[in-house]
């Protein structure tokens, strides 16, 4: 019987995990090992993937992968507690990480006073790592409620300690090279060799989190364990005997609440101490030399003797390297540069372990780790009862991820977001701001006339700067409103459910459900959408997602849509806007289907993800994100757009002999843009001024509107140049043509220059063809 056949609400015990490679290792690292109890929680609305409960937390996997996990309804616990084993009781505080207790003054060897103490902040996804980073550094990194918010390393300085540098690394579950985040984190720890590690552990789910802790301890880097969410642990009736756990692990353990700022000072004190005095974790042998783990014990110690010299030359801790070789880690094996005879001996050692354990090598090592964790938790942790948040989340999920209600709920939520943004809240605030901007422009024009300012200077200030920048600023409310709703959806935990719901549908076009998140973020801005693709473990999926993200209309294009909708489709704003968004999605789907069979052949990455509890988005976090987005928009408005506005005003106001022109058709701009304009004649907008606006849009999409405002002066002048069919085609072209220079730069950073150039050309060709077809269809009516 396989896990795929188990009914909802039923529990079984895992007999074996099939498959091979990095995915199988990832399943083992997540706790899907022989003897573990697993419960089916629910199936996605489309029947796939499935949510399971294991080790006290929820995980989603596909039915295809569940079919490779052998189970039995009648189970025998994989680990049996030793007879006569007594809890440690109320042990005295071991004193790790404290001066004069762990070491003697006369034998200490502190680092020089001017040494910069570097720390790596490491932990599982969604365990409060970025919140702790903000507490430690007083910075304002965005905190989400979706696994994998941190997609790049972020550096900061610990408050009041200028000679420190702490790096917030992407969240990982183990030191196995499954995803790009795990590889980035592992390479940082092995190559950059920070002076200390702050390992943040979710106290409410300590068993799963400690799997990573054990591997970090093998790195022999000074380390402090931060037990986060202890406030939630206490509220739900749980507790941790910190002294006993510290003695068990051999590293300082500090209970904290990153969200409330509790225990941060003590954590910093211990971290600084272990780093300054280079107090590495005490050597702890995780596997017993007796009983069923003796084979693993002998295997790891034999490998340690075999590779000791090679590990030292490669700069890899011997115990860590031995554990990884016992798991068949190819990257570590490559770095050690073993001879052929040594490789054969290594294989013989592993085969001997498999024969004695009756399971494969990866399962044996993973089982050893979880057994040690189970022993530690039995003696030190009183598990909390099911939290109110978990109960509430389950009730909400009955609707938002229900079989018959999940997809309608998603459509309704996204429809409500767009309606409120474009027709209610955003539109109302935009009208208010536009009225204010108009009054400022009139007042400024009158003041300049009264002061007798030169006509050229007045034209620059009023027609160039105020008219151009002001036309863009008026759309700030719409952009902020859209980001507000996207932030609410992410912080609440709903984004993870969207990935769960949409996985089966996205798989039909060659993607994983996790790809929906970068694309949804792309509706706000393409740049973070491209960066968010780093959470995808497959290079194929990552490239494909990045290629499709520009089809998701970013918020910077909203001013263009609103401008043309008001001019050519009055009273139909919501219909046109939603239509454009859906058309972009449709083009993305068609492109994905084409790429699936050509450029990106193969299967999408497996869907393995946690579903976090729902929570109320924090006002501070949402406000911080909105401020960052508003500030970014304003900075672009007064830098890139401001500069582009002045340049366009100059090129439009002067001819090649630098004489001011009365007719802009004789200007420098008309001459240059006139060379490009014929390309757009078949699309119904071959005017040189529109070509100019599209070129300026490559710098920043918002500048399209400011450029048109400067060149045409009024909406009436624009409507006299193009008809409804041309306007529809222009909207489609603006929807699909090349992303802005910032987005292209982010694509270049992720995929390289050739891919970035390819995206520019590809998007422009797609945009031209789609606009040509739309223009022809509209002309028929």
Segments from the language model and where they lie:
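Extended, low-charge hydrophobic alpha-helical regions
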Residues: 356, 363-367, 383, 424-465, ...
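Extended helical scaffolds that flank P-loop GTPase cores
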Residues: 277, 282-453, 660-669
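Conserved C-terminal guanine-recognition region of P-loop GTPase G domains, centered on the G4
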Residues: 161, 184-253, 560
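Canonical P-loop GTPase G-domain recognition
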Residues: 233-286
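Hydrophobic core segments of alpha-helical transmembrane domains in multi-pass membrane transport
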Residues: 409-420, 482-487, 565-567, 580-594, ...
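Conserved G1/Walker A P-loop phosphate-binding module
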Residues: 92-174
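Juxtamembrane inter-helical linkers in multi-pass membrane proteins
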Residues: 435, 439-443, 496-524, 601-625, ...
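Transmembrane helix-loop junctions at the membrane interface of multipass transporters and ion channels
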Residues: 551, 555-578, 742-752, 773-781
């Amino acid at each position: 019987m396989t896990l795929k056949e188990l009914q909802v609400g039923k529990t079984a015990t895992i007999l074996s995990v099939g498959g091979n490679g990095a995915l199988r290792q990832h399943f083992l690292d997540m706790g899907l090992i022989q003897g573990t109890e697993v419960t089916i929680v629910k199936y996605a609305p489309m029947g796939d993937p499935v949510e399971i409960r294991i080790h006290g937390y929820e995980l989603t996997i596909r039915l295809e992968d569940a079919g490779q996990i052998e189970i039995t309804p009648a189970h025998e616990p994989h680990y049996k507690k030793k007879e006569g084993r007594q809890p440690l009781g109320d042990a005295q505080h071991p004193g790790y990480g404290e001066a004069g207790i762990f070491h003697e003054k006369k034998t200490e060897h502190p680092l020089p006073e001017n040494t910069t103490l570097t720390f790596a902040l490491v932990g599982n996804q969604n365990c409060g790592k970025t919140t702790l980073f903000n507490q430690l550094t007083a910075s304002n990194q965005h905190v989400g409620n979706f696994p994998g918010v941190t997609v790049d390393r972020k550096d900061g300085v610990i408050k009041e300690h200028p000679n420190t540098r702490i790096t917030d690394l992407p969240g990982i579950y183990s030191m196995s090279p499954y995803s790009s985040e795990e590889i980035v984190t592992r390479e940082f720890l092995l190559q950059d060799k920070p002076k200390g590690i702050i390992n943040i552990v979710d106290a409410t789910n300590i068993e799963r989190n400690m799997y990573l802790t054990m591997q970090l301890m093998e790195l022999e880097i000074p380390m402090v364990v931060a037990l986060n969410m202890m406030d939630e642990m206490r509220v739900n009736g749980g507790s941790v005997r910190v002294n006993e756990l510290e003695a068990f692990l051999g590293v300082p353990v500090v209970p904290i609440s990153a969200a409330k700022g509790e225990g941060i000072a003590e954590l910093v004190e211990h971290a600084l101490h272990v780093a300054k005095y280079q107090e590495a974790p005490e050597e702890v042998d995780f596997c017993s030399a007796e009983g069923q783990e003796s084979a693993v014990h002998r295997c790891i110690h034999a490998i340690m003797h075999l590779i000791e010299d090679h590990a030292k030359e490669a700069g890899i801790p011997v115990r860590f390297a031995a554990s990884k070789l016992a798991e068949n880690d190819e990257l570590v094996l490559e770095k050690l540069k073993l001879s052929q005879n040594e490789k054969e001996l290594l294989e013989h050692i592993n085969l001997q372990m498999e024969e004695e354990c009756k399971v494969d090598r990866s399962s044996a090592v993973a089982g050893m780790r979880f057994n040690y964790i189970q022993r530690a938790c039995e003696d030190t942790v009183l598990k909390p009862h099911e939290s109110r948040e978990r109960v509430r989340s389950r009730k909400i999920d009955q609707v938002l991820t229900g079989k018959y209600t999940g997809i309608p709920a998603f459509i309704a939520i996204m429809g409500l977001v767009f309606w409120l943004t474009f027709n209610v809240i955003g539109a109302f605030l935009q009208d208010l701001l536009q009225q204010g901007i108009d009054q400022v422009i009139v007042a400024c024009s009158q003041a300049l006339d009264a002061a007798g300012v030169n006509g050229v200077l007045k034209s620059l200030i009023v027609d160039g700067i105020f008219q151009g920048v002001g036309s863009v600023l008026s759309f700030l409310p719409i952009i902020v409103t859209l980001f507000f709703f996207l932030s609410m959806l992410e912080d609440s935990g709903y984004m993870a459910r969207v990935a769960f719901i949409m996985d089966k549908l996205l798989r039909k076009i060659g993607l994983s459900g996790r790809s929906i998140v970068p694309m949804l973020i792309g509706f706000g801005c393409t740049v973070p959408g491209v960066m968010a693709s780093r959470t995808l473990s497959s290079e194929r999926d990552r490239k494909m997602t990045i290629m499709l993200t520009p089809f998701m209309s970013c918020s910077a294009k909203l001013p263009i849509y609103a401008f043309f909708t008001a001019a050519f489709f009055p009273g139909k704003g919501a219909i046109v806007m939603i239509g454009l968004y859906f058309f972009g999605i449709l083009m993305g789907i068609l492109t994905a289907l084409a790429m699936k069979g050509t450029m990106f052949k193969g299967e999408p990455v497996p869907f393995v993800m946690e579903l976090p509890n729902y929570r109320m988005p924090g006002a501070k976090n949402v406000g911080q994100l909105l401020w960052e987005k508003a500030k970014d928009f304003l900075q672009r408005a007064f830098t890139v757009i401001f500069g582009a506005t002045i340049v366009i005003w100059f090129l439009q106001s002067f001819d090649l002999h630098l004489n001011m022109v009365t007719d802009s058709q004789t200007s420098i701009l008309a001459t240059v843009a006139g060379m490009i304009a014929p390309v757009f004649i078949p699309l119904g907008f071959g005017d040189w001024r529109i070509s100019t606006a599209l070129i300026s849009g490559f710098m920043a999409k918002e500048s399209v509107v400011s450029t048109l405002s400067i060149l045409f002066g009024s909406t009436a002048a624009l409507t006299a140049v193009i008809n409804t069919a041309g306007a529809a085609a222009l909207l489609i072209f603006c929807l699909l043509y090349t992303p802005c220079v910032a987005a292209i730069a982010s694509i270049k950073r992720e995929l390289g220059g050739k891919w970035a150039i390819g995206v520019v050309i590809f998007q422009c060709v797609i945009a031209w063809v789609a606009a040509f077809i739309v223009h022809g269809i509209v002309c028929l009516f």
